[in-house]
Amino acid sequence: MLTRFSQAQQRPHSVAILDAQGAHTYESLWNKSSQIAHQLLGGSSDLEQARIAFMVSPGLNYVATLWGIWKAGGIAVPLCLSYPLPSLAYVIEDTQAAALVIDPEYLVLLQGYAQDNRIPLHLVEDLQVG
């Protein structure tokens, strides 16, 4: 992973990810992941290995979320996009996730659960400034 972080800084204009929206550079990935990390930290200096569960579709936002959690000092817990709520709840509870980061399309599935269990829920797009 350190190699990828190093590439992001040494070759910012190289393509890091190709997805349905097109080509994304390491610079774009680095900036988005930094914004996500900053928002997740919420004024703290480190997440201190808090587990952050995330349900984000493959593409730039998935990798930016993963990197953002790592940059903030958290442990990323990817959630399977096809799991039903009871299976997701099991993973979230078993890992003791401190927060959830999701794509808007999963809001209906997880919003009530997050509220009932007092787990902070973040839309990935709200964690990014630009």
What spans do the regions from the language model cover?
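Conserved AMP-binding/adenylate-forming
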Residues: 22, 37-83
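Conserved ATP-dependent adenylate/AMP-binding module captured primarily in the ANL superfamily
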Residues: 83-113
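Residue-level detector of anion-binding/catalytic polar loops
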Residues: 75, 98, 120
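Active-site charged/polar residues at nucleotide-handling catalytic sites that mediate phosphoryl
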Residues: 47, 94-95, 117
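ANL superfamily adenylate-forming
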Residues: 105-130
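AMP-dependent adenylate-forming
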Residues: 3-25
